Every structure is written in structure tokens, then in C-alpha cells.
């Protein structure tokens, strides 16, 4: 199966995940741990792949990431210009 990409990326939120994570002063490992503490399975490797645009982000992961990063899910997917 061939993935459709936007500018060579497989997702639209990866860059904003990285920006929000760095603004929160979290490592990829710390972000993964924060999500895992809420009962969801997302590893440091998965966060890295999301940020690099190497994987698709399922719609159910967007609110998990947004909640852990304290940002609006619509901002993560580029539908709002401000984080909150």
C-alpha cells in the first residue's frame, strides 16, 4: 500500500507535536510516559516517528497528544493558529 504524503510527510501534526513538546520542556520519553500514565500505549519511538512525519497519526491519538501537551487538538492538526 502506498501512503499519500504532504511534502514527504505522512502526517500533518508532527511538527506541531514537536513544537508543543519543546514548549512544555518535555523529552519524547517524558511525553510518552505522560500518555502512558493516562492508560494509553504510545512509546518514545512512536513520538519520534510522529514528529519526523514518518507515520500516520490515527484520529484517536490526536486528543491524547493534545491533552498531554496542553494544546487544542485543532491547533495540532493546523485548523487553529494559536496553541490554546
Where are these regions (language model features)?
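Short, basic-rich loop-to-helix N-cap that marks the start of a DNA-contacting helix
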Residues: 45, 52-67, 83
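Residues that mark the N-terminal boundary/hinge immediately upstream of a DNA-recognition element
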Residues: 16, 27, 43, 58-61, ...
Amino acid at each position: 500500500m502506498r501512503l499519500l504524503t504532504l511534502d514527504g510527510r505522512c502526517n500533518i501534526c508532527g511538527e506541531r507535536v514537536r513544537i508543543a513538546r519543546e514548549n512544555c520542556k518535555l523529552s519524547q520519553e517524558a511525553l510518552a510516559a505522560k500518555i502512558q500514565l493516562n492508560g494509553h500505549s504510545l512509546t518514545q519511538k512512536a513520538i519520534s516517528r510522529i514528529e519526523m512525519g514518518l507515520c500516520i497519526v490515527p484520529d484517536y491519538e490526536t486528543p491524547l497528544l493534545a491533552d498531554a501537551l496542553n494544546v487544542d487538538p485543532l491547533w495540532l492538526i493546523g485548523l487553529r493558529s494559536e496553541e490554546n
